[in-house]
Each structure stands twice: as C-alpha cells, then as structure tokens.
Design a protein with these regions (language model features):
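A charged, well-structured terminal subsegment
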Residues: 98-115
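Short, acidic/small-residue loops that bind anionic groups at enzyme active sites
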Residues: 60-87
C-alpha cells in the first residue's frame, strides 16, 4: 500500500555510492526467503512492506514469523537487514509510518560503517 513511500524514504537515506537493487515479492511472508536467495550477492538488505491487522490471527502469524526470520537471517549471515516492515493495526497507522524506510536505511548504514 505504501511501498513507494517506504522505498523512497529508504533510498534518500543511503549513500550515493551504494548500488541499489529493488526486488519485488508477492508479500511480507516472502521477504525472508527472497533475502536468503541473495545473501551472497549483497552486503546488506532493507526489508520493506506493510501488514495491516484484519479480523483473523493471520496478522500475528505473518508479522511475527517474518520478523523472526529476518532476524535469524541477519544473525546467521552477519549481514545487516534493516527491517522496514510496517505492522499496523489500521490504515491510519500505516499513513503515519510510511516513511519508516528511512530508519531501516540508517540502521544498515550504521552497521556497515562499524569495524
């Protein structure tokens, strides 16, 4: 829903020297497996997406499993993965948080600059 704003806010906060490739996936649940396919190709990742709570527990399962999988990938690969996946209770929360991609970008830049 707010993919473009998330992506634009992330890109604006990355150094110009970074080579950026955007990879689209069907949904948030597919982000971790897609990152795992590209671990050898890239030094860092930014996961962007939005999950809005509905009337079933699906929101909880997707939010928790994708967050856990992304953290596991980052720890096991020792590569930073900025988590810019919005988990919102309603559309208004998503509107307010649509620039959170910037925080995910700043996080990976910070980790990459550590020695």
């Amino acid at each position: 829903m707010y993919k473009r704003q998330l992506l634009n806010s992330a890109k604006k906060n990355l150094p110009r020297s970074f080579e950026i490739e955007t990879i689209k996936v069907p949904g948030v649940f597919e982000i971790p497996i897609t990152i795992s396919k590209y671990l050898k190709k890239f030094d860092a990742f930014i996961a962007l997406g939005c999950v809005i709570k509905g009337k079933t527990p699906h929101f909880d399962f997707i939010s928790q499993s994708s967050t856990n999988a992304i953290m596991d990938l980052a720890i096991n690969s020792k590569k930073p993965i900025g988590n810019g996946i919005l988990t919102c209770l309603n559309i208004n929360q998503a509107k307010v948080r649509k620039k959170k991609g910037a925080e995910a970008a700043k996080a990976i830049v910070s980790v990459l600059s550590q020695k």
